[in-house]
């Protein structure tokens, strides 16, 4: 079994780690950074960019730069109305699913495909570090992700060419990293406020056992929302002064978003931030500039509703765990957004404890995922992880009511069966509507899909016995089976109508990704060989000039001949000729260098021989007179 990497696939940034020598190690990306922006872009040349390089060009290419795609993964269009209005790229409807529009390629991507490109970069960079191809991973998701979102994350891994061995909840991963070496039992509360989601989990950890007691959260709350209140403030202020709504201009919106994120980060350490955006727009009178000072107090006032929303999941998680704040030993803060002073203050106020800040909030989740990868690979022993399902699961029954089969915070994996019957006389089929959520009415909960069981023998209502079985695996992913006890007819779901991709769609995306990866690799190789050729042409020209008459003309002529041919090949983009000529010119330069040293050695030897011949014989005596002067 090869190395299993742990990947924190974040809304804003992602991170990858691996177990080395029994210890988790965070792997730096190809650019040398320990976290990678979860951003994918396509340029006017149709080149794909991922990570920091994609983020840097976002202002100039807002419609083809895709960020925060995690907020769309596994969701239907009607679930992301607000989020789709806040991004600079187009979000479209395809059936009930979300598609991301890419004008430069004239095509649509599923959010899973965008996430897959981020995963591919992380796994490729990890492979370069490890010196082997990475094919297996543990990927983290917010604890409050529903079944569709978990399956969609697994699909993204598959599209990226990864076998996803386990989907693990982010707070649980953080607890693994925090509690790996803890021997005594502790009850900890993990407060995880990331770029797009918010989770709270209460766990009991100690001596290798990690038991999740409860989890709660909000998948529509994260750092992006804090950025948005700053964007709205800047845009409203500018509109009040200039009468122009910058949110209608995609390029201006992207600049506002980047400025808002920068200001938010600065205000975690400073009491005010200067926001200066020259030439943000123009009117017939000339260019307009945005120049504004945002204080920490004003930011906290703007974000007060968001900060208050963090309180409820904390209280709910404690209530579900049947614990008081006094029974919690440590508060572990996870996610970059927990650096905000107002968030720290809220946690301290609600829990009456100072947060533990010994873990790196940007890396701890990936570290925990790597530990879980080590457990699955057999590298890490004596770890028992007991996680829970975040939301109740059930079916719709007569009257549009949701009947719960598995309650939230049930330890997974788990399996439960219930027997139901028909609603009318002579009914020969039943439709099973699978739901996830906490509301009483089916219409108020998340629909995971429907399926039909046919072939039920006609009988009076209430007589047939239909056994419905819910089975949740260790990834928190649900499968449902329905069986008529009378006829033995059975139907397992493939949940239809859910926002996850079909197997055929995933397989097609896997093939597309492989083809693109191959094309990208070929394109990269061409760029590398051309860069190498141009560098070598320059080095050869410089070397000949510096050596001058120190080498014979014949040797210089050979180098010059190859140099000219290679230069012509680069100008024509003749890559095959470049490959051959690079090697040939390199050899000629080696020979030229060797001849220089040979000539220098010959000259040194000649000088040594000359000195030997001119030495004075030691037996000769020379007489001399001297006079003493007083």
Swiss-Prot record:
Single annotated GO MF: unfolded protein binding
InterPro entries from the UniProt entry: ATPase_NBD (IPR043129), Chaperone_DnaK (IPR012725), Heat_shock_70_CS (IPR018181), HSP70_C_sf (IPR029048), HSP70_peptide-bd_sf (IPR029047), Hsp_70_fam (IPR013126)
Gene3D superfamilies in alphabetical order: 1.20.1270.10, 3.30.420.40, Actin, Chain A, domain 4, Substrate Binding Domain Of DNAk, Chain A, domain 1
SUPFAM superfamilies assigned to the protein according to its UniProt record, in alphabetical order: Actin-like ATPase domain (SSF53067), Heat shock protein 70kD (HSP70), peptide-binding domain (SSF100920)
Region named Disordered: 601-630
Induction entry: By stress conditions e.g. heat shock.
Acidic residues bias: start-end ranges: 619-630
Pfam families assigned to the protein according to its UniProt record, in alphabetical order: HSP70
Modified residues (Phosphothreonine): 197
Domain of life from the UniProt record: Bacteria
Compositionally biased tracts (Low complexity): 601-611
Alphabetically ordered keywords of this record: ATP-binding, Chaperone, Nucleotide-binding, Phosphoprotein, Stress response
Function field: Acts as a chaperone.
Family statement: Belongs to the heat shock protein 70 family.
Name the UniProt record assigns to this protein: Chaperone protein DnaK
């Amino acid at each position: 079994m090869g190395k299993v990497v742990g990947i924190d696939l974040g809304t804003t940034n992602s991170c990858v780690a691996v177990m080395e020598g029994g210890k988790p190690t965070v792997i730096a990306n190809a650019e040398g950074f320990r976290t990678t922006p979860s951003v994918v872009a396509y340029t006017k040349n149709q080149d794909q960019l991922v990570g920091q390089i994609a983020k840097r060009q976002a202002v100039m290419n807002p419609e083809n730069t895709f960020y925060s795609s995690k907020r769309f993964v596994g969701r239907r269009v009607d679930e992301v109305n607000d989020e789709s209005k806040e991004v600079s790229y187009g979000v479209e409807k395809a059936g009930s699913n979300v598609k991301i529009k890419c004008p430069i390629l004239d095509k649509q991507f599923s959010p899973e495909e965008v996430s897959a490109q981020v995963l591919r970069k992380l796994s490729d960079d990890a492979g370069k570090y490890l010196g082997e191809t990475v094919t297996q991973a543990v990927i983290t998701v917010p604890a409050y992700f529903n079944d569709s979102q978990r399956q969609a994350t697994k699909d993204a891994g598959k599209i990226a060419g990864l076998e996803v061995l386990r989907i693990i909840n982010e707070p649980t991963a953080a607890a693994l990293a925090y509690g790996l070496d803890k021997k005594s039992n502790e009850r900890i509360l993990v407060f995880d406020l990331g770029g797009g989601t918010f989770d709270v989990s209460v766990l009991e950890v100690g001596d290798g056992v990690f038991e999740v007691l409860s989890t709660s959260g909000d998948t529509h709350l994260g750092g992006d929302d804090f950025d948005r209140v700053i964007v709205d403030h800047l845009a409203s202020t500018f509109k009040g002064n200039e009468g122009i709504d910058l949110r209608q201009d995609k390029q201006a919106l992207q600049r506002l978003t980047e400025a808002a994120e920068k200001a938010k980060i600065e205000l975690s350490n400073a009491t005010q931030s200067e926001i200066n955006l020259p030439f943000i727009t123009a009117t017939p009178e000339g260019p307009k500039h945005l120049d504004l000072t945002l204080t920490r107090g004003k930011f906290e006032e703007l974000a007060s509703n968001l900060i208050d929303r963090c309180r409820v999941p904390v209280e709910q998680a404690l209530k579900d765990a049947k614990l008081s704040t006094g029974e919690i030993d440590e508060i572990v803060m996870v996610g970059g957004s927990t650096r905000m002073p107002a968030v720290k203050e809220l946690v301290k106020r609600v829990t009456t404890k100072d947060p533990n800040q010994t873990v790196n909030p940007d890396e701890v989740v990936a570290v925990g995922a790597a530990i879980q990868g080590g457990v699955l690979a057999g590298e890490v022993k004596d770890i028992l992880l007991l996680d829970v399902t975040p939301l109740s699961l059930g079916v719709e029954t007569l009257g549009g009511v949701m009947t719960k089969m598995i309650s939230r915070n049930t330890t997974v994996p788990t399996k439960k069966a219930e027997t139901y019957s028909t609603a009318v006389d002579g009914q020969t089929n039943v439709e099973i509507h699978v739901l996830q959520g906490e509301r009483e009415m089916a219409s108020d909960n998340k629909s995971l899909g429907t399926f039909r069981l046919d072939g039920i023998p006609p009988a009076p209502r209430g007589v047939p016995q239909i056994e419905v079985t819910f089975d949740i695996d260790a990834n928190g992913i649900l499968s449902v089976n329905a069986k008529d006890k009378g006829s033995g007819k059975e139907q397992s779901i493939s949940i239809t109508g859910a926002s996850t991709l079909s197997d055929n769609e995933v397989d097609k995306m896997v093939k597309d990704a492989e083809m693109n990866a191959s094309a990208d690799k070929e394109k990269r190789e061409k760029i590398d060989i051309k860069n190498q050729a141009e560098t070598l042409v320059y080095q050869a020209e410089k070397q000949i000039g510096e050596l001058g008459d120190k080498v014979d003309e014949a040797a210089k002529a050979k180098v010059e001949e190859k140099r000219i041919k290679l230069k012509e090949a680069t100008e024509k983009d003749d890559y095959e000729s470049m490959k051959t000529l690079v090697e040939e010119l390199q050899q000629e330069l080696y020979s030229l260098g060797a001849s220089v040293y040979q000539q220098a050695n010959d000259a040194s030897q000649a000088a040594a021989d000359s000195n030997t011949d001119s030495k004075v014989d030691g037996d000769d005596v020379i007489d001399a007179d001297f006079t003493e002067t007083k």
